[in-house]
Amino acid sequence: MMVFYLSVVLAAIAVMGLIALVNVLTVRSLMPQDHPWDRPLVSVLIPARNEERTIGITLSTLAEQDYGNYEVVILDDNSDDATFAIASQWIARDRRFRIVKGSPLPEGWVGKSFACHQLSREARGQILLFVDADTVHSRFSLSAGVAELQRSGADLLTAIPRQRTESFWEHTLLPLLHFVTFAFLPMPLVRLVRDERLAMANGQYMLWKRAAYLAVGGHEAVKSVMVEDVWLARLVKEKGFHLAIRYGALAVSCRMYASLAEIWDGFSKNIFPGLGYSIPAVAGLVLFSFATSVLPFFMMIDVAMTGGWTTTAAELVAAQVGLMLLIRFVLAIRFDTEIWSALLHPLAMAVMIGIMVNSTRWVLAGGGSRWKGRVYNSRNQIVTH
């Protein structure tokens, strides 16, 4: 029975390894040498709530784009810090920049979706680029994105930024974003299969053809969804439009979180809502993560220390650990994260399991998902501001 269990777990890890290998070999990147054959007006749209720490560098890099035809619109989403003041400084410096004050958040809307909805109504461009207020852009971020949008024939192009990490916990936990994305979602099937479940997007960089954005209903169609980027990507495929996912490390980077507390809260905000508030789904994910990413490493320690394992069982455990580490090493090399962080995979996944439980606890305990001073209940209705 033990050998059968170990074989099933090894098979699951092998499938993840195959998916990761295919993705590493096939995922395209945004490249500086890519130039659009046409340069329609691009509206760069930035929702900003309490972003005084980062918005200045974001705007400074957007001001230096080599794409000549664009505007930048910032929406201050009722910030209570210096976000509006910092962003306002750019209005006098650059006529391409505009800032608007966000309306109060209405019932039934998640804050970011409402901010993006307001931005879309302010935009003048044929192309809409939604970016986060903590992204840093190379000079060719717009031109490479538009070129790839045109080349691919996509209606929505989303780029996965390079994650800038500094602290121990950032190095340990944030590479899991690549692991979850590239070891679970077969990217070729995103292009080839219409099934909307085979879709994802990264809200840090979403480049739309305006007509497609309006046709799927824009952010209003996902107004009560916490993980709006993924659900918009699903809508794109559901409505018969084309989705392209690219690695954007050379074009855009982001330092999402600066501490374990920020990572804990940021991921807790998304996981349970992203699973549709389904207790069976989160329980299954916890068990799967423990069985494939945590338990094998404890078993390997026991094999080494006690020797009380059959040869076959010991070999299966060693294969599980070796293959999982190989997956993480390959992803670290391809996506330019610290190699040593791969060795901390069981620690990272143990913490992630804790975050899954916390995300569920937030909602079931009656409080709700929390982000940027707002709390949402299980229907993503605003509870407190």
Give a label for each model feature:
Residues 40-43, 71:
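Cell-envelope/extracellular polymer assembly enzymes that use nucleotide-activated donors
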Residues 149-183, 211-214, 219-282, 369, ...:
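Catalytic donor/gating beta->alpha subdomain of glycosyltransferases that bind UDP-sugars
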Residues 36, 281-366:
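Membrane-embedded multi-pass helical conduit in multi-pass membrane proteins
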Residues 59-106:
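Acidic donor-binding segment of Leloir-type glycosyltransferases
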Residues 9, 23-26, 98-121, 140, ...:
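Long helical/loop segments within the catalytic core of UDP-sugar-dependent glycosyltransferases
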Residues 26-32, 51-64:
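Short, well-formed alpha-helical segments that are part of the catalytic scaffolds
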Residues 82, 131-148:
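Acidic donor-binding/catalytic loop of UDP-sugar-dependent glycosyltransferases
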Residues 1-38, 175, 187, 352:
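N-terminal membrane-anchoring/stem segments of glycan-assembly enzymes
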